[in-house]
Amino acid sequence: MQAIKCVVVGDGAVGKTCLLISYTTNAFPGEYIPTVFDNYSANVMVDGRPVNLGLWDTAGQEDYDRLRPLSYPQTDVFLICFSLVSPASYENVRTKWYPEVSHHCPSTPIILVGTKLDLRDDKETMNKLSERSLRPIAYPQGLQMQKEIHAVKYLECSALTQKGLKTVFDEAIRAVLCPPAKNKSKRSCQLL
């Protein structure tokens, strides 16, 4: 069985841990507890192939900027996450997460993930955003960011409803098993 290491990064509170817990246990966690570092594992079948998917959760908070890259060596695929209802977390994909990941692992594939899809249609959330003259991130904006950061795919999901959730991890596995033609170079991740 092939083992794949998938590291999940993104701002604090965008839903990285919920994404992983909902996927691995089919249950949505209740309260928010900031992650320092966690590991999950799932045996899955993708396209008829058994895979052991090692899922590495990371802390998005700036306090952990020096610690986080310790989880990057030998990463096969990254999920860079942002919340669809947090424009700041979307901007940080460009200014923080892509630069960090591409610095440490320049040829490792990236899946860009918009989280909290269920809240994009939530009236209360929309009102809070519009009070601050903000709007949720629309699908075309996600596609634009995918191009900018050279991500293999852009996907949206909800850990709460599980809509699009399995697809995120299936596509992460496919990015490793069937790499895009342009990424034929040997994947290596160095810690400098």
Curated annotation (Swiss-Prot):
One of its GO terms (biological process) is innate immune response. Highly expressed in respiratory tubes and coelomocytes. Moderate expression in intestinal tissue and body wall. Low expression in tube feet and longitudinal muscle. GTP binds at residues 13-18, 30-35, 116-118, 159-160. It is found in: Cell membrane. PROSITE patterns: RHO. One of its GO terms (molecular function) is GTP binding. SUPFAM superfamilies: P-loop containing nucleoside triphosphate hydrolases. It is a lipid-anchor. GO terms for cellular component: plasma membrane. A lipid is attached at residue 189 (S-geranylgeranyl cysteine). NCBIfam families: small_GTP. This is Ras-related protein Rac1. It comes from Stichopus japonicus (Sea cucumber).
